[in-house]
Amino acid sequence: MKAKEIRDLTTAEIEQKIKSLKEELFNLRFQLATGQLENTARIRQVRKDIARMKTIIRERELAANK
């Protein structure tokens, strides 16, 4: 998901997406440990998406404090 798409979402929607991505990341790591994961790059994508979303939430918090 691109940063521009994330910025169009509300903070509550972003937090919900973070929660679902964390669940997906947990499942991906579990699959990796059991040898069932084929697309290992997906773990990196999910981690980056979570980081992007957290960054945008933090930007909003800092902008609100100004």
UniProtKB/Swiss-Prot annotation:
The GO cellular component terms are: cytosolic large ribosomal subunit
Instruction: Look up keyword Lyase and say if it applies.
Output: no
Among PROSITE patterns, the record links this protein to: RIBOSOMAL_L29
Q: Name one GO biological process term.
A: translation
The alphabetical list of record keywords is: Ribonucleoprotein, Ribosomal protein
Q: Which PANTHER family match?
A: 60S RIBOSOMAL PROTEIN L35/50S RIBOSOMAL PROTEIN L29, LARGE RIBOSOMAL SUBUNIT PROTEIN UL29C
- Name assigned to this protein: Large ribosomal subunit protein uL29
Q: What is the lineage of its organism?
A: Bacteria, Bacillati, Bacillota, Bacilli, Bacillales
